[in-house]
Amino acid sequence: MRDDQIFNLIEKEKLREKEHIELIASENFTSLEIRQAVGSVLTNKYAEGYPLNRYYGGCSFIDEIETLAILRAKELFGAKYANVQPHSGSQANMAAIMALINPGDRILGMQLSHGGHLTHGSRVNFSGIFFNTYFYGVSRDSELIDYDEVLKIARDCRPNLIIAGASSYSREIDFKKFREIADDVSAYLLCDIAHIAGLIVAGFHNSSIDVAHLTTSTTHKTLRGPRGGIILSGKDFNKLVTFNGKEKTLSNAVNSTVFPGTQGGPLVHVIAGKAIAFREALQENFKEYISKVIKNTKVMAEYFKSEGFRIVSGGTDNHLFLVDLSSLDLTGADAEKLLERVNITLNKNAIPFDKKSPALASGIRIGGAAITSRGLNESDSLNVAKFIVRALKTRSDIELKQIKKEVVRFIRDFDMP
């Protein structure tokens, strides 16, 4: 019997996505092929272990699928090693951290309120519960990462692991400088490229693969794949590490921390979706897509500046930027709810040195990846920014209703992938 309750809600979500302007920087739209793979019979199969070494029978086709995903990931990122099994970016980070250091060791990561991520040492996350954590941030003046300050902090706290990467930092990250700092204090370097993976494989951001000991990423966001995680390594993939009191290559240690260390059976249907996403990202038109993402994002940021808004760090080099709403006496939480009323979806976000709590926040985060997937160009993105500014400045019910009508009429012209 059909579950009408669930399928009616799915249809409502489908309509919401079609009639809303999606600006959440961590979201994107997958291709139909990816959705078909993720919704396929592969969801039925249990496959603990790795290709040719499973704990269950009947995995011959599963082995081929996972092997394809691994080969495509290695080709796409220029990596020597890839593990495509992590269920999420957070689980990829957990497995990577466990392969490199032991509970109680020291981690130096980016301050969450300055653009970092929960898994980079936050006290409420496994990374801050099981490890001793220290933090670097951005300069108060420039709102850019101060690498000299990172080195100073690293020399003071002597971390076993440094994590480079961010969830709301709009500038290019110099991974080579982070490796120099890590080498200076004899630490491992883990680079989390979840947000910028698409930019890296398209050649619009420097790569961490041969710089970091390990690189982690999600497979959605700018990669446009299904929700999931991946762990990669370049020239250090065969480096010997001490794991559970024994010497192992780094790649073997990661395989152990993914399964059986943090997961059981992999999500084979999602791995198939990842394989398709990697193939899509290997096509020439993916570079064109990422180029448009960056242009669209810059256009929006510049319009906000022209309207008197302060953009954190003064601009953007990637797919996102933060808008400081302090001049409007409006919290990020208020703005998020206000814009939802006009069918524009984004998220509240703390800004560096924010005096408001994370639940309120002083800023909003805006991303250009999803709208670009729907075919919006620079002129269209400018219109999106204008809708937002109008809504934030007016706040009157009558005007908000009018903006919503205009938004729906505008965005309906752009097909969903």
UniProtKB/Swiss-Prot annotation:
Role: Catalyzes the reversible interconversion of serine and glycine with tetrahydrofolate (THF) serving as the one-carbon carrier. This reaction serves as the major source of one-carbon groups required for the biosynthesis of purines, thymidylate, methionine, and other important biomolecules. Also exhibits THF-independent aldolase activity toward beta-hydroxyamino acids, producing glycine and aldehydes, via a retro-aldol mechanism.
Pfam families attached to this UniProt entry: SHMT
UniProt name for this protein: Serine hydroxymethyltransferase
Source organism per UniProt: Borreliella afzelii (strain PKo) (Borrelia afzelii)
Reaction(s) this enzyme catalyzes, per UniProt: (6R)-5,10-methylene-5,6,7,8-tetrahydrofolate + glycine + H2O = (6S)-5,6,7,8-tetrahydrofolate + L-serine
Keyword 4Fe-4S (UniProt): no
Entry binding sites for (6S)-5,6,7,8-tetrahydrofolate: L112, G116, H117, L118, E247
Cofactor(s) demanded: pyridoxal 5'-phosphate
Top enzyme category: transferase
Alphabetical list of PROSITE patterns matching this protein: SHMT
HAMAP family membership: SHMT (MF_00051)
PANTHER family the record matches: SERINE HYDROXYMETHYLTRANSFERASE, SERINE HYDROXYMETHYLTRANSFERASE 1
Any one Gene Ontology BP term: tetrahydrofolate interconversion
InterPro entries: PyrdxlP-dep_Trfase, PyrdxlP-dep_Trfase_major, PyrdxlP-dep_Trfase_small, Ser_HO-MeTrfase, Ser_HO-MeTrfase-like, Ser_HO-MeTrfase_PLP_BS, SHMT-like_dom
Keyword terms, alphabetized: Amino-acid biosynthesis, Cytoplasm, One-carbon metabolism, Pyridoxal phosphate, Transferase
Pathway involvement of the protein, from the record: One-carbon metabolism; tetrahydrofolate interconversion; Amino-acid biosynthesis; glycine biosynthesis; glycine from L-serine: step 1/1
Coiled coil feature spans: none
Record-marked site positions (Plays an important role in substrate specificity): H220
Oligomeric form and interacting partners: Homodimer.
Chief localization: cytoplasm
Gene3D superfamilies in the record: Aspartate Aminotransferase, domain 1 (3.90.1150.10), Type I PLP-dependent aspartate aminotransferase-like (Major domain) (3.40.640.10)
Entries under SUPFAM superfamilies matching the protein: PLP-dependent transferases
Gene that specifies this protein: glyA
Enzyme Commission numbers on file: 2.1.2.1
CDD domains (UniProt xref): SHMT
GO MF, one annotated term: glycine hydroxymethyltransferase activity
Gene Ontology cellular component terms for the protein in this record: cytosol
